[in-house]
């Protein structure tokens, strides 16, 4: 057992790269505030090695004052994570409407970017979302699932897409968050060579397998095969 990095106030982001060589971390720093919650305090997002050396700074965000309203968010880079299908690639979202869709109308609320170790190239656009970015479920360079959400309409939309491609995403599901009967659930995942979960594709039939609890007295589990 040994210490990695320096003593600090660490945020909620702390994860090991799929190839187990790097750490993605967030540290909280001053000035603190009584006017915003702790997760909106200034935070620095960076990649360090397993000896604690800083490798790359992704963002150094100031205090965040998120306005009231549906689908508002941070105007700064957010939702950092590792691509589960690559050895050491970080992705994140950036609001194109400065975090306030009512004050700043845009065709796309968010753009998702990525950058790969050794972080000596420009960030690369992964995808765009018309609504607020929620998540990406990875498979490989040719296929992933992109999920966007709207608190205003209470809807989640799931698309199939090719990461970092000019091809338009294809809508797969458009479901109300209040409609449990038609909720397709979550895709079945399997572990890849890095030990990370990726979306399972039944290549024999070009299908995804979806798992859902269901909302019927006759059963609590539903498996759905979806052609992609």
Task: For the regions a language model picked out, list residue spans one by one.
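Beta-propeller folds
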Residues: 1-228
